[in-house]
Amino acid sequence: MLDKADGSIYNEGTANTDEVFAAERRWNGRSSAGQASCLPEKGPVLHGRTAGPEGMGMKQNRPCRLVCVLCALAFALTALPMAAFAQQPEETAAVQQSLTAADVRGMQQADAAVTELTDSEDYTRMSEDERIDAALQQLEELTRQGLVKQGSVYTDAENGMVSFTYSCGALGGILVADPEEENAAALPQLEKEQLQQLAENKRVGTAAIYYAFDNTINSARYPYYAYMQTYWDSVGLQTRLDTTVTVSDLRRMGDYDLCILSTHGAYYTYEYGWLWKRTATEPLILLSEKSDFWSDLRYGFDLLAHRVVKVNGMYAVNGDFFRSAYRGNGIVLSETCEFYGKNGHVDTAMADGLLAGGAKAVMGYVNNVYSVYSRSMLWATVNRMIEGETLEQAVDYAKSIYGTDDIIWYNEQGGRRPHAAASYAMLSGSRSAVLPNPYTAQEAAAAA
């Protein structure tokens, strides 16, 4: 029961024992009000303490005190891991749910320093090891200025990334590896009969190509995507080509029956935890949207929730972003490197996020993929889906032409130095997913 006079808990059955008060004062020389200890096996109790040393369990109380100390120590040790791991990557954002103007100014100052390094001619001429050293030096200076969190810098040489955490808690990175070089190759042309047949197709849905490989200026890649957009639009698939892809654009992917992610990807590893450091690794889709003050404010919640990351001063998104942002029931085809992770660490986070938002099916690649291989696979797959095939049928057809992985294709082109690990397509969701069918049952039966 709570004693309202002094706020302590007492034993109502012995609270009126005057002898107990006297004995207690003789024992420790002071009032015991409000002090607690273990209960003895025998003897009257007041305020959770034995009445005194004379026959009231003083000898028994000493080991009890020791037990209490040990219990408290054990509880503290038990609580430490809980506290150390309490701030998981997702939960860190809960501490702060919006960016202030001061936060954004700090990030912009850090981004300016990072991009000054990564956009320099000296950086382009450096080896990966030299880039890592330069990145670490830059981040050390930013840490000294209070713009980067102390102890947050992590070097992932295997995946060509140096990650860090801004002082506000958002995640950032410096990419030190170059993306796969473009090996220009013309798209295979369809036969005249096929062109005529496809030209007679009715509308088979809508599509969007999210092109962020480059800024399209003097680009070796862009003309192929412009051709695909024009061609698909002419044969029944109403196609939009987005060459200035933003985080906001990706939020509207659910408006289309087919979405194509034509951009670079990366594997991002970062550290978290304040006592015992832990690492987390995830695939990222890299955009060409440069960070600025107002965009940081607009994307502030996603940045703090670690759904959006800034790499080389530009935005990138992960699987949690799609889980939060995608709302649709379309098909998603990705050309990005490591969309499904890599050998030994296949990661379905991207696809899982899209499927959680309602996507019918997702296709992407494990490992770094040759851009010409992924583009050729895309071309063949979409053309077959326009003809009415399922996603699985269309992908199998593309594999029959270009090979089941990109090293097979590379060797058939006469290549002599393939990259380390073959890239291959993976499917998630409904393998029987198709584009909208514009034909009635009678028309389909007549065509058969």
Q: Can you describe what each PLM-predicted range is?
A:
Residues 69-79:
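Bacterial N-terminal signal peptides
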Residues 141-203, 341:
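Structured catalytic cores of large enzymes
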Residues 3, 10-11, 27, 45-47, ...:
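Short, positively charged and aromatic/hydrophobic N-terminal segments
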Residues 79-90:
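Sec-dependent signal peptide cleavage junction
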Residues 331-447:
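Active-site-proximal C-terminal subdomain of hydrolase catalytic domains
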Residues 91-146:
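Short Lys/Arg-enriched alpha/beta "domain-start" segment
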Residues 99, 103-119, 185-290, 300:
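A domain-level signal for caspase-like cysteine endopeptidase catalytic cores
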Residues 268-361:
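Cysteine protease catalytic core and zymogen-processing segment of caspase-like enzymes
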